[in-house]
Amino acid sequence: MSKMTKKMKKICEIKSSLKDYKFNNLISILNSFPKAKFNENIDVAINLRINTKKSDQNIRGSIILPNSIKKEKYIVVFASGEDKKNAYEAGANLAGMEEVSDKIKNNKKLKIDHVISTPEAMPIVEKLGSILGPKGLMPNPKLGTITKDIKNEIKKIKSGQLNYKNDKYGIIHTTIGKINFNNLELKINLLYFLNHLVKTKPTNLKGVFIKKVSLSTTMGGSVIINHNEFLQENNISDNIKK
């Protein structure tokens, strides 16, 4: 069995000394963990009570949080003619048709954050399924990434739009803030996301939808919050059973 690092020991000591993981304590708790030398993300993991083997219970979508987490994104657009021109004007890093496909095939280490496609270009994109699919980069109409409104989609991405989907265990992982956010900024973002998420609850799913919510920093430990109390205090219903 491997030895616990000094950093992990410190995190465990802090967590074991705490008895109250209410939201208002979270920023101070996360800030008390050993820090990295950069402005770490604050990530959320949300365990959902869904059956991932049923296609109608899988959750995916996109959202722009009130307090944006903007960062530079490498955006690839599959389009031609005027749509290609619009893509570059809106800030795409790479746009085109077959030439873009060839570049991706020949440089599999290319760090791409988002791929957008016009409907007409999808036959080219589909041939890249084995490369883009495992990275979660395939354009999808539910996410708005198959569109003729290229400029608007790029604008949303650059404004901090987050894409999310559950993994095979029914857990959604995404970022809701930075370690330099204050308590109110983080609270607003988490509330906004949870309220949005509750509205995506499958119609055939009865009872509790959200099972567990935990927050963590990029390099630190995670803390489970009392999400039922948090939701109720802010008048968000998850059909919580008493």
UniProtKB/Swiss-Prot annotation:
GO terms for cellular component: cytosolic large ribosomal subunit. Keywords: Repressor, Ribonucleoprotein, Ribosomal protein, RNA-binding, rRNA-binding, Translation regulation, tRNA-binding. InterPro entries: Ribosom_uL1_bac-type (IPR005878), Ribosomal_uL1 (IPR002143), Ribosomal_uL1-like (IPR023674), Ribosomal_uL1/biogenesis (IPR028364), Ribosomal_uL1_3-a/b-sand (IPR016095), Ribosomal_uL1_CS (IPR023673). One of its GO terms (biological process) is translation. PROSITE patterns: RIBOSOMAL_L1. One of its GO terms (molecular function) is tRNA binding. It holds the Pfam family Ribosomal_L1. CDD domains: Ribosomal_L1. Gene3D superfamilies: 3.30.190.20, 3.40.50.790. It comes from the Bacteria. Part of the 50S ribosomal subunit. Belongs to the universal ribosomal protein uL1 family. Binds directly to 23S rRNA. The L1 stalk is quite mobile in the ribosome, and is involved in E site tRNA release. Protein L1 is also a translational repressor protein, it controls the translation of the L11 operon by binding to its mRNA. This is Large ribosomal subunit protein uL1. The lineage of its organism: Bacteria, Pseudomonadati, Pseudomonadota, Gammaproteobacteria, Enterobacterales. The gene is rplA.
